[in-house]
Amino acid sequence: MRLREMTEDDLPQVLELQRELAFQDWNEKQFLSEIRASYADCIVCEDEGRECGRGKTRCKLLGYAIFHLLGPNSELLSIATRESEQRKGIGSQLLHAGLDKLTDPDDQCFLEVRNSNVKARAFYEKHGFKLYSIRKKYYADGEDAALYRFSRRSPR
């Protein structure tokens, strides 16, 4: 496995990953916008099989993460790992790749997640994110959002 910057060539696999996980929050145009934004950090984790790289077929995308790095207040916009690859540390690697770019002790990273997504909430809490608020009826279907904050000052 290796982490690298997301490129436009990754979009078919990124969109496929969203379909696999049954969430299609973003479309191709939105991903393109993030890849091109100077303040966005778009990371992918890919399988380094024998048949990928150096002009051969593309490596299988295992997961991705998108952060907005906005000085002291960054945001995790999206993170996903193929279902078959979950619980293997890929999500943790992707998350840490973004959080490691927070270098000042006062830097923070924010995120929102569906209140009912217990699995994701446990993942974020395991990595040092603290729940700081609930945003009522945030999503189009009326579900609440759980708002989390990661601070460099608090231990991971």
Which residues make up each language-model segment?
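Extreme N-terminal starter segment of soluble prokaryotic enzymes
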Residues: 1-3
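Acetyl-CoA-dependent GNAT
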Residues: 5-84, 88, 92-102, 151-155
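Well-formed, non-transmembrane alpha-helical positions, independent of function
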Residues: 13, 122-123
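Conserved hydrophobic/aromatic "anchor" residues
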Residues: 31, 64, 85, 123, ...
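A generic structural signal for beta-strand entry/edge sites
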Residues: 71-73, 108, 145
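Short glycine/proline-centered loop/turn elements that form peptide/ligand docking sites
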Residues: 91, 95, 116-120, 137-142
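Conserved GNAT acetyl-CoA-binding A-motif
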Residues: 102-112
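Conserved catalytic-core motifs of GNAT/GCN5-like acyltransferases
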Residues: 110-114, 125, 130-146
